[in-house]
């Protein structure tokens, strides 16, 4: 299809105009290239004949070299501009040839129209594909942002839970410690009171001069009073 399209375009009057314009374009490009090559050669000859470290640079030579370099840059700019304009002209000639060829309404013209329709359809599909890809990328970026925020919120929530549990454990530990201290103080107090009562009872029995050894009940009481009051003995 591409070969038939090129043949149909090349056989039109626009192609003849393009072919006629080609020699002038080639001649101008060759002239610019020759001028550029000549200027390069002149600059190299001046640099070789009079190196900067030998101190032989006169004002005229330096000016000529600078002028040659500027001219060389201008030639490059002109060449680029010429190539751009030539490309634009070729596009215009091609469009004009296509228009004229389509007006003939023959088999080649219909082929050109169908090809152009296919190209337009493909371009439209490419644009739609780019739009869909952009939407997918935006959705993917949104998902990544939401995932990042969820991870951040999850980390903050886990930290809050850990801090709350640690504080609760600390409060429970402090309460247990306070309760144990309270129980210990009560036990010490009860132990002192019990020891005092033991001493009082022992003194009473001894002061009454009772033969407690003959009485089993008194002997058991005396032996019990002589024991050290502790939690293990109480148990």
From Swiss-Prot:
The UniProt GO MF terms for this protein read: kinetochore binding
Region ranges (Disordered): 1-23
Query: Mainly resides where?
Result: nucleus
What GO terms fall under cellular component here? inner kinetochore; kinetochore; nucleolus; nucleoplasm; nucleus
Among the GO biological process terms of this entry, one is:
mitotic spindle organization
Stretches assigned to coiled coil: 125-145
Q: Where in the cell is it found?
A: Nucleus; Chromosome, Centromere, Kinetochore
Keywords for the protein's UniProt record, in alphabetical order: Centromere, Chromosome, Coiled coil, Kinetochore, Nucleus
Protein role:
Component of the CENPA-HI complex, a centromeric complex involved in assembly of kinetochore proteins, mitotic progression and chromosome segregation. Required for the localization of CENPC but not CENPA to the centromere. It however may be involved in incorporation of newly synthesized CENPA into centromeres via its interaction with the CENPA-NAC complex.
Q: How does it assemble?
A: Component of the CENPA-HI complex, at least composed of CENPH, CENPI, CENPK, CENPL, CENPM, CENPO and CENPP. Interacts with NDC80.
Q: Which family does it belong to?
A: Belongs to the CENP-H/MCM16 family.
Spell out the protein name for this chain.
Answer: Centromere protein H
Q: List the source organism.
A: Gallus gallus (Chicken)
């Amino acid at each position: 299809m591409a070969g038939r399209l090129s043949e149909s375009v090349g056989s039109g009057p626009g192609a003849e105009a393009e072919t006629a314009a080609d020699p002038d374009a080639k001649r101008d490009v060759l002239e610019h290239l020759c001028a550029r090559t000549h200027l390069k050669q002149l600059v190299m000859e001046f640099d070789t004949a009079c190196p900067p470290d030998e101190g032989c640079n006169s004002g005229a030579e330096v000016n000529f070299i600078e002028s040659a370099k500027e001219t060389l840059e201008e030639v490059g700019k002109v060449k680029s501009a010429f190539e751009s304009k030539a490309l634009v002209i070729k596009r215009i000639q091609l469009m004009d040839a296509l228009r004229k060829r389509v007006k003939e309404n023959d088999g080649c013209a219909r082929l050109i129209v169908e090809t152009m329709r296919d190209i337009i359809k493909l371009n439209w599909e490419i644009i739609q594909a780019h739009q869909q890809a952009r939407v997918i990328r935006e959705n993917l970026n949104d998902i990544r942002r939401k995932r990042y925020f969820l991870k951040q919120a999850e980390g903050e929530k886990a930290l809050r839970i850990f801090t709350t549990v640690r504080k609760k454990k600390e409060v429970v530990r402090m309460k247990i410690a306070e309760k144990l201290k309270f129980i210990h103080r009560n036990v010490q107090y009860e132990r002192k009171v019990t020891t005092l009562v033991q001493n009082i009872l022992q003194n009473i029995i001894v002061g009454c001069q009772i033969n407690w050894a003959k009485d089993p009940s008194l002997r058991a009481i005396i032996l019990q009073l002589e024991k050290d009051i502790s939690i293990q003995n109480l148990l």
